[in-house]
């Protein structure tokens, strides 16, 4: 009798994706983050669904409905904080996943990488709209400031902003449509994830050496299922520690004040995972220039395959590029710190220098270091 796992039209897809999938024998824990992102997405969809059952997307009751969830709904506080901190965990995993891809040259899988960049943009859009829903001060002003950036687009800017707002300011129409989009986008993300995996399984996974691993493959199950399970346990442990002991650690106290269009908070800033991009936006005095730099700070990832000059795929054996890579990581941490600081001396100049070095490292220094390393190895003949 043939195994149902290998014959059933639906089960065999799962079999080829998660059970009998040939995987490189040497992929490290940096390859765990894909499955952890899948877990994060599932947690967010489930907790989000239960939150949506009690939430009301009306300006007069949105803030109260979130308070009601936390006070009156059975385990509502748990669901709410799992959802809020789950987003932070999602972004931690995303940044590590992208960082892994950059370090080991996974961006040479063009289709997989480009879908990944689209996924990153989509998740960022979803997180931004989700932050608006509790209708606290930072929700309202964050929505006002970020949507207002579109007014920098020549000619159609102002019309576009008012069209997105559904009026002349961020109001009921804005909140309702943001709720609708925040609800639908995770399902679009899920569809994109399937496409992401589809393209990945066309080529197979990369590995730390960046070399072809066709000669040395092992089945995904049980080797990597058990490895992913360990990662999942660590993720859940970290998330629940955050939720149960430090639920407001990454949140903004201003969001416990109901939205008030007549009172601007002293420092408008987004959630921590957007601070690096926010710092780049603020470092350019021109509005349109800032918006373009903001978009480019993420879109630059799509250009990585074309900026790869080395004959080696991975950075594993490329010490000069490694130094630049870790400088870039440190630089992003500086940008994240600056994004949360007020616009005054010395933070302005630090932010501008960090923004310049961010783009310089990726666009100029890394491609040059790739060429230098090839010359040192006498590979550039």
Curated annotation (Swiss-Prot):
Keyword Transmembrane on entry: yes
Organism: Chrotomys gonzalesi
Membrane topology, as annotated: Multi-pass membrane protein
Name of this protein: Cytochrome b
Entries under Gene3D superfamilies matching the protein: Cytochrome Bc1 Complex, Chain C
Function: Component of the ubiquinol-cytochrome c reductase complex (complex III or cytochrome b-c1 complex) that is part of the mitochondrial respiratory chain. The b-c1 complex mediates electron transfer from ubiquinol to cytochrome c. Contributes to the generation of a proton gradient across the mitochondrial membrane that is then used for ATP synthesis.
Cofactor note: Binds 2 heme b groups non-covalently.
InterPro entries assigned to the protein according to its UniProt record, in alphabetical order: Cyt_b/b6_C, Cyt_b/b6_C_sf, Cyt_b/b6_N, Cytb/b6-like_sf, Cytochrome_b, Cytochrome_b_C_euk/bac, Cytochrome_b_N_euk/bac, Di-haem_cyt_TM
Pfam families referenced in this protein's UniProt entry, alphabetically: Cytochrom_B_C (PF00032), Cytochrome_B (PF00033)
UniProt KW keywords: Electron transport, Heme, Iron, Membrane, Metal-binding, Mitochondrion, Mitochondrion inner membrane, Respiratory chain, Transmembrane, Transmembrane helix, Transport, Ubiquinone
Domain of life assignment: Eukaryota
The family this protein is said to belong to: Belongs to the cytochrome b family.
Cofactor(s) the record lists: heme b
A GO molecular-function annotation: ubiquinol-cytochrome-c reductase activity
Keyword Chloroplast: no
Binding site for heme b b562: 83, 182
């Amino acid at each position: 009798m043939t195994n149902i796992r290998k014959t059933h039209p639906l089960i065999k897809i799962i079999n080829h994706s998660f059970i009998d999938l040939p995987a490189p024998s040497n992929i490290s824990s940096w390859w765990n983050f894909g499955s952890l992102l899948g877990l994060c997405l599932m947690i967010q969809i489930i907790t989000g669904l239960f939150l949506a059952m009690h939430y009301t997307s009306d300006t007069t009751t949105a803030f109260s409905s979130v308070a009601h969830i936390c006070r009156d709904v059975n385990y509502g506080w748990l669901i709410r904080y799992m959802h809020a901190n789950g987003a932070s965990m999602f972004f931690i995993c995303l940044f590590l996943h992208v960082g892994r891809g950059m370090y080991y040259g996974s961006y040479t899988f063009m289709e997989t990488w480009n879908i990944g960049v689209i996924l990153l943009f989509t998740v960022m859009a979803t997180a931004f709209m989700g932050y608006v829903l509790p209708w606290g001060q930072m929700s309202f002003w964050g929505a006002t400031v970020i949507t207002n950036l579109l007014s920098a687009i020549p000619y159609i800017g102002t019309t576009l902003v008012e069209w997105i707002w559904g009026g002349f300011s961020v109001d009921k129409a804005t909140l309702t449509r943001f709720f609708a989009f925040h609800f639908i986008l995770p399902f679009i993300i899920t569809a994109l994830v399937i496409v992401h995996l589809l393209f990945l399984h066309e080529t197979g996974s990369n590995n730390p050496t960046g070399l072809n691993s066709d000669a040395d493959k092992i089945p995904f199950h049980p080797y990597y299922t058990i490895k992913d399970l360990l990662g999942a346990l660590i993720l859940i442990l970290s998330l629940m520690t955050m939720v149960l002991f430090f639920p407001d650690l990454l949140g903004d106290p201003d969001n416990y004040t109901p939205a008030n269009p007549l009172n601007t908070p002293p420092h408008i800033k987004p959630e921590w995972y957007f601070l690096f991009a926010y710092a780049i936006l603020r470092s350019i005095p021109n509005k349109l220039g800032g918006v373009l730099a903001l978009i480019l700070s993420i879109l630059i990832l799509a250009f990585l395959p074309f900026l790869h000059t080395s004959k080696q795929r991975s950075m594993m054996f490329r010490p000069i590029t490694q130094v630049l890579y870790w400088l870039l990581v440190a630089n992003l941490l500086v940008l994240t710190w600056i994004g949360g600081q007020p616009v005054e001396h010395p933070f302005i100049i630090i932010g501008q220098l960090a923004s310049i070095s961010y783009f310089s490292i990726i666009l100029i220094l890394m491609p040059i270091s790739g060429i230098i390393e090839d010359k040192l190895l006498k590979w550039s003949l």
